[in-house]
Amino acid sequence: MRILFAAAECAPMIKVGGMGDVVGSLPPALAKLGHDVRLIMPGYSQLWSKLQIPDEPIWRAQTMGTEFAVYEAKHPTNGMTIYLVGHPVFDPERIYGGEDEDWRFTFFASAAAEFSWNVWKPQVLHCHDWHTGMIPVWMHQDPEISTVFTIHNLKYQGPWRWKLDRITWCPWYMQGDHTMAAALINADRVNAVSPTYAQEIRTAEYGENLHGLLNFVSGKLRGILNGIDLEAWDPATDKALPANYSAADLTGKAVCKQVLQERMGLEVRDDAFLLGMVTRLVDQKGVDLLLQVADRLLSYTDSQIVVLGTGDRGLESGLWQLASRYPGKCAVFLTYDDDLSRLIYAGSDAFLMPSRFEPCGISQLYAMRYGSVPVVRNVGGLVDTVPPHDPNADRGTGFCFDRFEPVDFYTALVRAWEAYRHRSSWQDLQKRGMTEDYSWDRSAVEYDLMYKDVCGIKEPTPDAALLEQFSRGQDADPSRADQIDVEPSSSSSAPMTPPGRNPLNRLFGRRSG
């Protein structure tokens, strides 16, 4: 099956969050199942030094009144074909942010749609997060291309409809207040990156004001757990580590701990309980919760804390102040460094993820793979990946807490600290986490089933009045539309675009060839 990924990130070249890991690692696993998977992404200026890109593009075209070029390259580790949308708007050294962010990603989405119609036509176009949210809208009237939309983080929803009307051409059948909502309505299948998150986003607490809409489209919504690349993340072969180790022999992990303590300016103590955290410093990740309990933890236990990440200035300042109060016990590195992140996974005894919400989370998978026991909140993908430690039954791989409260988090930390005193059982806990199978091969099978289910399928345009009623949280069941007194919208009977025609032609005022 021909599958085209459209995304704003791809590891290891361009990575800000978990989406980059998914886009970089899932395609090779799908290729093992016989699929021809390719990627289209923005041609960021950083990529020209990281990939071998020919001087001449393979295609030139125009969209949104702007010319662009598409270059072909290969993924540096797995050989996947990558198409880069080249335009000066992608030249600045940034991925997200900037005043032109909405225009920039809408332009990319439009270019990706044009490429799919005119150069390499996939059977399934797999879109990732709001940056590609307009693609399912434009593809909705093309019977030859089915669309899948993956929600990596529902909190970020893209430009609102009024702005889209100004910067691009919104089809007459488009519904939804913003890019994310439009994608949820028009995609033929929707998935979240963990089963628990797929259920949570249908509630008011985690639905980011889209829970009504997500309940409306629940028939095409599913949760598929993320995985990790077990070859790229293997402590037995990782060249970034000062010593390698495995579940069968943990000797090298003690060496990694000592090197981490030395590099971060901590007291070099084998008996210290070293806690690691590699994260974006944002509200979602629970860094504020750590700041509320860290003083007590560092004052009354022999714990040490290492934090790596960047983000909110207030959280950065709070962490700097914490480190200054506890020299030798707390260290903060406000940047992102892949080699250092691997050393933290390898050198830490436990790994912190006290998230407010967590669509899936990949850091806890890396941590377990490297023998760092996760301390997490029971939310989203953390529920699906970190079973709670049960010392009586010798089960579980981490320590969990339920409420987003300092006392709950602190209690979980103390439980982990006490468990660390019993080294033999602690090593058993580490080994259970290291031998769990969270490979992409398992996840790829579920994506394969979804692709086969959606290929050749086009979901009908939902009735506008019924959609509006359901999105406002009213008790409407889309399967019982005949029992609800609403007027059918004209879009419900709109004719499909004939095969071989580009639905954007009439939007751009062009004739079909």
From Swiss-Prot:
UniProt xrefs under SUPFAM superfamilies: UDP-Glycosyltransferase/glycogen phosphorylase
Gene3D superfamilies: Glycogen Phosphorylase B
UniProt KW Glycosyltransferase keyword: yes
Keywords linked to the UniProt accession: Glycogen biosynthesis, Glycosyltransferase, Transferase
Pathway the protein contributes to: Glycan biosynthesis; glycogen biosynthesis
Biased composition (Basic and acidic residues): 474-483
Protein name: Glycogen synthase
GO biological-process terms attached to the record: glycogen biosynthetic process
InterPro entries: Glyco_trans_1 (IPR001296), GS/SS (IPR011835), Starch_synth_cat_dom (IPR013534)
Superkingdom per UniProt: Bacteria
Its biological purpose: Synthesizes alpha-1,4-glucan chains using ADP-glucose.
Region: Disordered, residue numbers: 471-513
GO MF assignments: alpha-1,4-glucan glucosyltransferase (ADP-glucose donor) activity; alpha-1,4-glucan glucosyltransferase (UDP-glucose donor) activity
Enzymatic class: transferase
Residues the entry annotates as binding ADP-alpha-D-glucose: K15
